[in-house]
C-alpha cells in the first residue's frame, strides 16, 4: 500500500462511487468551508495505481493558540475491513496533521452501526478513541450521528405509497392545490434567503447570510451537486380553480336539494351533504378573497418555500429548507419534497437523506418536531458509528475536552433565549 497523488476530479470520482462516500468529502465542499475559517488537504492510498482509500482533511485554528484541529468529516472513505489501506490513510493523515500542528484528528465515518463491526474494531486497534453512541443530535458531535433516509429507487407510485398514510394524502392534496415547483438558478437564492429569514424568525434559530448559500451553490452547482428548488403560488391560476370548485359545489347542493324533494328517506343524508358543501363553499370564498388580495399586491405570484438539494453519487441530501408563513394550507413543502425526490432519482440517486434526528424522542423534546416530520416520508433511521478522535497532543486535547462542555452549555443557553424572544 502506498501514498498516491491524485487530482481533485479523481478524488471526487472515488468518493461518489464508494459506498462510504459522502457529500462532505467532495473537494468542492471544502470550498464552502473557507468562509468559516477551514482549509483543506487531501490524501489517497492505493496499490498498483488503483485508489483504495481517500480522505479530505479540514483544518481550523484553535483560537489564540498555535494549534489546529484536523477534522475528516464523514471520512475516511475506505473499506474499513481493509486494515492495510486504513493504516496507510492514518499514517498519511498523521504526517499532514502534525505538519499543521493539529492536536487531534477527528473522524465520523458514513458507516452504519449494523455494518460497522470492522470499522469499530479496526479504528480502536489503531488508537482511535470512540466518542460513544449518544443521541443523533447530541451537542457532543459535529455531525448528526443519526439521519433519516428515504430509499427512492422505485417508481412514482411505489415512492408515494412508501410514505405514511396521512402524509401520502397530504402529498396528493398538495399536487392538486395549484403550486408550481421550480428548479431555480443563482438569482433565486435571494428569494431563498428571504424565506430562510422568515423561517428562522418563526422557529427561533439564527439564519445564515445569503453569501453562505451563494458559496455552496457556486462551489457545487457546476458539477450538478447542488440545485435550488422554489415553490410558487400563482394567484390568477388558483382563482380560476377556486371558481371551478365553487361552481361544482353549488351544483352539488342543487342536486341534493332535488333529492330531498323526491325522497324522504334520503332527506337526512341530503341535508348532511348540503351542510358539508356549504362549509366548503365558505372556506373557498375566504380563500378566493385572499387570492384576489394577493393578485392585487403580487400579480406575478409569490414564493412559499424553497430548498437546497445536494448530491454525492447515488446519495442525495435535503440540506436546507425554508418556508413562508402565508398560504400554508397549500402544503408547498409536501409538493417540493416529493418533486425533489423524483428529481434526485432521475439524476442517479437511490437515497434521499433528510438530515439529522434523534431516535423517537419524547414529545416534550426540542427535537420531536424534526423527527415527526422526517419519519413520515418512508424513511429509515441511519445510525452511524459516531465520532473517533486520534490524539496527537494529549495535554491540549484533555484541556479542550474539559472546556468544551462549558462552551456547549453557553451556546445552548443563548439559543434558548433567542427562541423565547
UniProtKB/Swiss-Prot annotation:
Pfam families the record matches: FemAB
Example of a GO MF term: aminoacyltransferase activity
Biological process terms in GO annotation: cell wall organization; peptidoglycan biosynthetic process; regulation of cell shape; response to antibiotic
Catalysed reaction equations from the record: beta-D-GlcNAc-(1->4)-Mur2Ac(oyl-L-Ala-D-isoglutaminyl-L-Lys-D-Ala-D-Ala)-di-trans,octa-cis-undecaprenyl diphosphate + glycyl-tRNA(Gly) = beta-D-GlcNAc-(1->4)-Mur2Ac(oyl-L-Ala-D-isoglutaminyl-L-Lys-(N(6)-Gly)-D-Ala-D-Ala)-di-trans,octa-cis-undecaprenyl diphosphate + tRNA(Gly) + H(+)
EC number: 2.3.2.16
Any one annotated GO CC term: cytoplasm
Signal sequence residues: none
Subcellular location: Cytoplasm
InterPro entries: Acyl_CoA_acyltransferase, FEMABX, PG_Glycine_Bridge_Synth
Keywords assigned by UniProt, alphabetized: Acyltransferase, Antibiotic resistance, Cell shape, Cell wall biogenesis/degradation, Cytoplasm, Peptidoglycan synthesis, Transferase
Extra information: Since cross-linking between the peptide strands is critical for maintaining stability of the cell wall, FemX is a potential target for the development of new antibacterial agents.
Quaternary structure, from the entry: Monomer.
Role summary: Catalyzes the incorporation of the first glycine of the pentaglycine interpeptide bridge, which is characteristic of the S.aureus peptidoglycan. This glycine is added to the epsilon-amino group of the L-lysine of the membrane-bound lipid II intermediate (GlcNAc-(beta-1,4)-N-acetylmuramic acid(-L-Ala-D-iGln-L-Lys-D-Ala-D-Ala)-pyrophosphoryl-undecaprenol), using glycyl-tRNA(Gly) as donor, in a ribosome-independent mechanism. Involved in methicillin resistance.
Entry's family note: Belongs to the FemABX family.
Official protein name in the record: Lipid II:glycine glycyltransferase
Species this chain originates from: Staphylococcus aureus (strain NCTC 8325 / PS 47)
Upper classification of the organism: Bacteria, Bacillati, Bacillota, Bacilli, Bacillales
Gene designation: femX
Amino acid at each position: 500500500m502506498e501514498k498516491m497523488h491524485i487530482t481533485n476530479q479523481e478524488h471526487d470520482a472515488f468518493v461518489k462511487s464508494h459506498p462510504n462516500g459522502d457529500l462532505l468529502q467532495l473537494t468542492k465542499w471544502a470550498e464552502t468551508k473557507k468562509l468559516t475559517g477551514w482549509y483543506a488537504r487531501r490524501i489517497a492510498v492505493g496499490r498498483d495505481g488503483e485508489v483504495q482509500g481517500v480522505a479530505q482533511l479540514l483544518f481550523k485554528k484553535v483560537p489564540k493558540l498555535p494549534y489546529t484541529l484536523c477534522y475528516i468529516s464523514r471520512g475516511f472513505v475506505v473499506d474499513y475491513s481493509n486494515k492495510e489501506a486504513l493504516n496507510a490513510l492514518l499514517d498519511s493523515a498523521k504526517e499532514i496533521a502534525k505538519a499543521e500542528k493539529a492536536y487531534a484528528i477527528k473522524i465520523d465515518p458514513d458507516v452504519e452501526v449494523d455494518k460497522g463491526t470492522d470499522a469499530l474494531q479496526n479504528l480502536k486497534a489503531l488508537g482511535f478513541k470512540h466518542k460513544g453512541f449518544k443521541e443523533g443530535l447530541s451537542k457532543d458531535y459535529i455531525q448528526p450521528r443519526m439521519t433519516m433516509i428515504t430509499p427512492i429507487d422505485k417508481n412514482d407510485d411505489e415512492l408515494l405509497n412508501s410514505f405514511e398514510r396521512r402524509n401520502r394524502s397530504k402529498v396528493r392534496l398538495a399536487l392538486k392545490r395549484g403550486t408550481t415547483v421550480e428548479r431555480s438558478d443563482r438569482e433565486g437564492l435571494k428569494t431563498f434567503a428571504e424565506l430562510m429569514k422568515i423561517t428562522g424568525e418563526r422557529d427561533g434559530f439564527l439564519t445564515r447570510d445569503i453569501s453562505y448559500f451563494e458559496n455552496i451553490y457556486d462551489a457545487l452547482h457546476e458539477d450538478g451537486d447542488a440545485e435550488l428548488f422554489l415553490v410558487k403560488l400563482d394567484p390568477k391560476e388558483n382563482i380560476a380553480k377556486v371558481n371551478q370548485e365553487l361552481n361544482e359545489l353549488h351544483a352539488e347542493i342543487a342536486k341534493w336539494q332535488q333529492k330531498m324533494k323526491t325522497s324522504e328517506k334520503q332527506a337526512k343524508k341530503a341535508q348532511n351533504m348540503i351542510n358539508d358543501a356549504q362549509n366548503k363553499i365558505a372556506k373557498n370564498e375566504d380563500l378566493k378573497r385572499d387570492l384576489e388580495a394577493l393578485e392585487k399586491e403580487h400579480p406575478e405570484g409569490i414564493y412559499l418555500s424553497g430548498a437546497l438539494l445536494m448530491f454525492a453519487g447515488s446519495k442525495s441530501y435535503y440540506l436546507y429548507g425554508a418556508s413562508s408563513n402565508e398560504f400554508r394550507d397549500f402544503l408547498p413543502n409536501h409538493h417540493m419534497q416529493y418533486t425533489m425526490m423524483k428529481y434526485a432519482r432521475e439524476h442517479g440517486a437511490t437515497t434521499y437523506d433528510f438530515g439529522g434526528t434523534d431516535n423517537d424522542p419524547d414529545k416534550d423534546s426540542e427535537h420531536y418536531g424534526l423527527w415527526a416530520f422526517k419519519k413520515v416520508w418512508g424513511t429509515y433511521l441511519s445510525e452511524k458509528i459516531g465520532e473517533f478522535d486520534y490524539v496527537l497532543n494529549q495535554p491540549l486535547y484533555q484541556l479542550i475536552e474539559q472546556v468544551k462542555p462549558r462552551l456547549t452549555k453557553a451556546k445552548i443557553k443563548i439559543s434558548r433565549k433567542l427562541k423565547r424572544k
